[in-house]
Amino acid sequence: FFFLMIRRPPRSTLFPYTTLFRSGFDGEGQITSAITYVTSENNPKVYWVTGHGEASESDLSTNFSDAINKNNVEISDLALMTDDIPEDAEELVIMSPTTDFSEDEANKVITYLENGGKLLMFTSYTGTDMPNLDSILENYGVKRSSGIVVETDSQHYYPQMPYYLLPNIQSDDITTEVKSNYILMPVAQAIQKLDSYRDTITIKSLLTTTEDAYIENDPENSTWSKSADSETGAFDLGVSITETVDDKETQIIYFSSASMLSSQIDQAISGANSKLAATALTSMCDVEQTVVIPSKSTSYTNLVFTQGAVNTWSIITIAGIPLVLVVIGVMIWMKRRKQ
């Protein structure tokens, strides 16, 4: 095996040449990241909360972990049941817990945030209540719906899956790099503002549905049709929350669909989900500004069709084209008949 070393005493990094080539060329990205690593004084430390059935970094799209690694973010596991949040924690990640936090664990997170902490949070619909986990969000002015969001605008959901949402992307520094892409959010819950919260809190929408969306409270038995008593409207699926008190700025970025980071979903939209998530993570910690160069892929790029696009092309191919051919045929027949 051959290895490439980037070294600037006392720091160095080493990786085999085989990692430069996957389904594309990644040499520029890895070398640029390595140079940044050896020339930086410190790398940000992010703690990944465990102990509640959370998804680990290895469970998610490799595009997400690659982007984190290229930013030289150091990630460590943190079991809140037994450990306090370390003083060097620049950010916490809560990734799709399947069981609730204890009250003590939730209070640890809230105390950390009240002292200027940062949190990147993804949740998944489980059908079970998690009051302690939800208390973290409610302390900062938002709650998640008990059901999932269903979209009825055919331009904003994946074909034949109205619960696989293609939300509107709002303008923000976090969303700039994906503004021209689709973001795919499967089985997402609505993020709703509380009726009252502290006036020091600012809640900004990142991803939103159309006004035609509704909340389905019983997705296991749903016919995916809106009823008269369905809660409808434009719902947030991703938000950025900030609060500044006594020169301490708390920041939370929350997305209500952890499935957006699965490899299959991320690949369906050519890595846009992982790019958004990685930008969200690095925006809240002290990452030295550098250019993250993605690998130059030799594979294909997926073409994403909404249900509306599928309907349009179906009409064109099933009715439009045959009709045109019939008209042309009739015109030719009439012309020959006159001759």
Regions found by a protein language model. Give the residues of each.
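Short, surface-exposed patches at the edges or C-terminal ends of soluble domains, predominantly
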Residues: F1, P16-Q339
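Residue-level detector of conserved catalytic or cofactor/ligand-binding positions
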Residues: M5-T19
